[in-house]
UniProtKB/Swiss-Prot annotation:
The lineage of its organism: Bacteria, Bacillati, Bacillota, Bacilli, Bacillales. It comes from Staphylococcus haemolyticus (strain JCSC1435). InterPro entries: Anthranilate_Pribosyl_Tfrase, Glycosyl_Trfase_fam3, Nuc_phospho_transferase. It catalyses: N-(5-phospho-beta-D-ribosyl)anthranilate + diphosphate = 5-phospho-alpha-D-ribose 1-diphosphate + anthranilate. This is Anthranilate phosphoribosyltransferase. Anthranilate 1 binds at G78, N109.
């Protein structure tokens, strides 16, 4: 196979060749062993940033050749893989951000390395995921839509067995948060591998994001944490990417270890999320949600600074608006709070 020879010679693939690569891996008629050979060779070579963009574009175009756009929308998510077993921070954040009037299209999955993935938590909360075709109406009515990654990209089921047979991480460990079916305006993306931060920030620029934050949490998490310096690459509206660190204590938040942020089963994480949204939780779990919500409010241009984002996120919780957003999503109330 020509692709195998190119990969053996460490030759960077073109967009057309990458599409062939994806088509091969997602073809159910090709046996898994042959797919393993190809993905193994791709994984052995150094993955270039351009190739990450090509892989993401190929997957999106395969499923959504006319990718829909929702102006002003944001997704807050992480790559997973940090093995921290934290509670569902980004899902909890999504309710708060949506309560600020920002359209949130959250792309999530079931648990892979944690006890409870985004979809697992939603099931426990009694909130259904939204079909891609129904997202515009869902956003219009409630301002927040949760999309199941497995439902929006069923072709990925043909790649899963291949990944399981390869012992090392592959490019598919980082593409999940990048293939939202909608062309987003903003994104906050947590990454477990700090060496991939700039690559992912550049890919988000290639995908047309107006603004984005790509971060690696202190001590290895794929969320901003309270335990030290969080590394950030920020894409601004001018297309510039800047690199800096943020520390929760600089914003008046108390230092806490990553272990203090651990969750549990979907049922246990449900109670954590509800306690935070209701304002009952005053612990570090609330603080880490406020910090991550602040980044989303900042990157989506709702506020001018991260500090202002922390103030607004706190108000959204304490005023009850975040809880109202949750109740709307569950169908408990229909009235909006302006």
């Amino acid at each position: 196979m020509r692709l195998l020879k190119q990969l053996d010679n460490n030759i960077t693939l073109t967009q057309s060749e990458t599409t062939q690569f994806i088509t091969y891996l997602t073809n159910p008629e090709i046996n898994v062993e042959d797919k393993v050979d190809l993905l193994t060779q791709f994984t052995k070579k150094e993955i270039k940033q351009q190739e990450l963009t090509y892989v993401v574009n190929s997957l999106i175009q395969t499923m959504y050749p006319n990718q829909p756009t929702y102006e002003g929308s944001i997704c807050v998510c992480g790559t997973g893989g940090d093995k921290s077993n934290s509670f569902n921070i980004s899902t909890t954040v999504s309710f708060i951000v949506a309560s600020a009037g920002i359209p949130v299209i959250k792309h999530g999955n079931r648990s892979i390395t944690s006890h409870s993935g985004s979809t697992d938590l939603l099931n426990e909360l009694g909130i259904k995921t939204t079909k891609v075709s129904e997202v515009p109406l869902q956003i219009e009515e409630q301002g927040l839509a949760f999309i199941s990654a497995m439902e929006s990209y069923p072709i990925m089921k043909y790649i899963q067995p291949v990944r399981k047979m390869i012992s090392t991480p592959t490019i598919f460990n980082i593409v999940g948060p990048l293939i939202n079916p909608f062309k987003l305006t903003y994104q906050v993306l947590g990454v477990y591998d700090p060496s991939r931060l700039y690559m992912i920030a550049q890919t988000l620029k290639d995908l047309g994001r107006r603004r984005a934050i790509v971060l690696h949490g202190a001590n290895g998490m794929d969320e901003a944490t309270l335990s030290g310096n969080n590394e950030v690459y920020e894409l601004n509206e001018n297309g510039d990417i800047t690199h800096y660190f943020i520390n929760a204590k600089d914003y008046g938040l108390k230092v806490a270890s990553n272990q203090d942020l651990q969750g549990g089963s979907p049922k246990e994480n449900k109670m954590i999320t509800l306690d935070i949204l209701s304002g009952d939780d005053k612990t570090c779990r609330r603080d880490v949600v406020v910090l991550n919500a602040a980044l989303a409010l900042y990157v989506s241009e709702k506020v001018d600074t991260i500090a202002s984002g922390i103030s607004l996120a706190t108000i959204l919780i304490d005023s009850g608006r975040a809880m109202v957003q949750f109740m709307k999503m569950r169908g408990d109330i229909c009235d909006d709070i302006k």
